[in-house]
Amino acid sequence: MNEVYEQTCFQIISFAGTAKSCFLEAIECAKAKGDPSELLKEGNDAIQQASISHQKALTLDANGELEVVLLLIHAETILSSAETVRDLSQTIID
């Protein structure tokens, strides 16, 4: 596994995990009658960074520089989960 690929996957995992945590905290904040806007912004910023890293992985794949291995699948699963929680958090908070 090449180093750029590994680093890219770990960036996706890290940013997506941060985003998911922020969105879940925003839900709890709203339930407690607080203002979740800063947590939502932080989550959206993190998910944007995860998406940029994911695009980098897709570019590596398109250039034939990437072998699909479990690490990328794991990273994509975490990113997908974070996107789902983001969407649900808006519904729950609104």
Model-derived features: positions:
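Terminal alpha-helical segments
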Residues: M1-D94
